[in-house]
Amino acid sequence: MPEDCPAVEDATHLKIASTVIGGQQVVTDYATPDFNELQKVKTCRLDGDLRPELPLHLAFDYNANINWAVTGQVFRSEKYGRDALHVLSSMFTKNERKLRELVQDWNTYYAPHKANNRVVYYYYDTTAKHKGYAISGQQDFKDIVIEELRRFGWEVNAIDMGRPAEHELKHKDINEALAGVSYPFIQINTENNEALIVAMENTGVQIGRDGFRKDKSKEKYIETEVDPLELRTDGTDAFDVLFMGVKYFQHSMDGICLPMRWKK
């Protein structure tokens, strides 16, 4: 944790210690963090891998029962010696808390970042052009995200990726990036992405007449204690959009909401 962390400063309180030295009582003032209070502080100020000078890259997955947001930055990896997509965090809202609440949670978490860089690259595909089941209202999902982010003071570069990439292309690109053999490499903050990592590890593959694809059959099942919504494939879909967006669309025209073509 950095020494000048604002969250630590906010949770630090003055206390008094009393001891006896040479037969005399000595009272000393000292400052110490309230660690119970620190546990409640959930913002990006505690993230050591966040680069304050760089923009954020963001993608969502939209569903009736669970909505996901996955956030990253692109910068040089010490491990690979080249640029990598650093997956900083993932978060979700479930059941009665929908997409708008998720964007609000995301803003609360990343609000301190706006002091240094308020630019967000928001990647979305045709799945974001639906409405209804992930929100209360009749706006497209992408419009809700853009509206909320701008309301909170973010400069949004909305990048329309068009139709989702083919499963074979996503599978190949992501596996090669995870293996460190193709750009952009992937590095994941394990503490901030626990559910996402488990979901990625649990994701299976279905093989049909159109080739192989991600097995998303569990998304239709009722949530149970041993099979919670956050450990299913929904979060991995948001991760896929983020990765493919960074790989193929990162250098699109800033601020232009136009569908782009996949670069084969």
What is the role of each PLM region?
Residues E9-L14, V20, F243-K264:
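Acidic two-metal-ion nuclease catalytic site recognized across multiple nuclease folds
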Residues R51-F75:
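Gly/Thr-rich phosphate-binding beta-strand-loop-beta motif of the actin/hexokinase/Hsp70
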Residues G235-F243:
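Glycine-rich phosphate-binding/hydrolytic loop that grips phosphoryl groups
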